[in-house]
Regions:
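Selective transmembrane helix interface/packing segments
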Residues: 1-227
Length: 227
């Protein structure tokens, strides 16, 4: 257990990287790398797009984008369609951040600051979507539903949401690490590699889906109050 404790402390430690005399957290540097990678891939995939006689690459890209857009639009409705690009962008970032562990790089999502930032961005957009759909008065009125006595609970619910999103993502990613370390202690050869691949690939993608799905559900609830 001492080995597990030491490994956990090392994993939770925020490493700093010196860039031009500035100490920058490793998770931030890795996030920059992920964003640069996504920008380059986006440029490569979207260049030379055509209206007629499209290439197989463009056909596959359109199918993927249309499928994801239809999924979120079906969940949020037409009013929530404007927020689909954000959800897709966050999904791509979290997926890459979780999968980067396959290459021996510490995932940024193991840094509580990163998951907290993602949760805060999402919750700001969730509340904005509610204000945009209902108007300022309608949003304030929703805080008193179903009766004014519930106002403190409704405000508390808004405050709890980012904590829920943040800790769920951080906790699941960290939990996968703890499971891997326990497996290494029991079966140190061969088996850990298989479980590591599973946790890095499938569990990382599952956590991506859970985060954006919960964000979209909260957003739907916030928008749907006007109906």
């Amino acid at each position: 257990m001492n080995a597990l404790t030491a490994a956990l402390k090392e994993e939770l430690n925020v490493e700093m990287i010196s860039l031009g005399g500035l100490q920058v957290p490793e998770s931030v540097v890795v996030s920059w790398g992920i964003m640069l990678f996504l920008v380059i891939v986006s440029i490569l995939l979207t260049r030379n797009l055509k209206v007629d006689h499209i290439s197989r690459r463009q056909a596959i890209l359109e199918l993927v984008v249309t499928t994801i857009d239809s999924f979120f639009t079906g969940l949020l409705g037409e009013q929530g369609r404007r927020y689909v690009p954000y959800l897709m962008t966050v999904a791509l970032y979290i997926a890459c951040a979780n999968l980067i562990g396959v290459f021996g790089i510490k995932p940024p999502t193991k840094d509580l600051n990163v998951t907290a930032a993602l949760a805060l961005m999402s919750i700001c957009l969730i509340e904005y979507s509610g204000i945009h759909a209902r108007g300022g008065k309608g949003f304030l009125k929703s805080l008193t539903a179903p009766t004014p006595i519930m106002t403190p609970m409704n405000i508390l619910e808004i405050a709890i949401r980012p904590t829920s999103l943040c800790m769920r993502l951080f906790g699941n990613v960290l939990g996968a690490f703890v499971i891997m370390e326990l497996i290494k202690l029991v079966v140190p050869v061969f088996v850990p590699a298989i479980f590591s691949l599973y946790l890095d690939l499938f569990d990382g993608l599952i956590q991506t889906y859970v985060f954006v799905f919960l964000t979209s559900l909260f957003m739907k609830e916030s928008i749907g109050g006007e109906e």
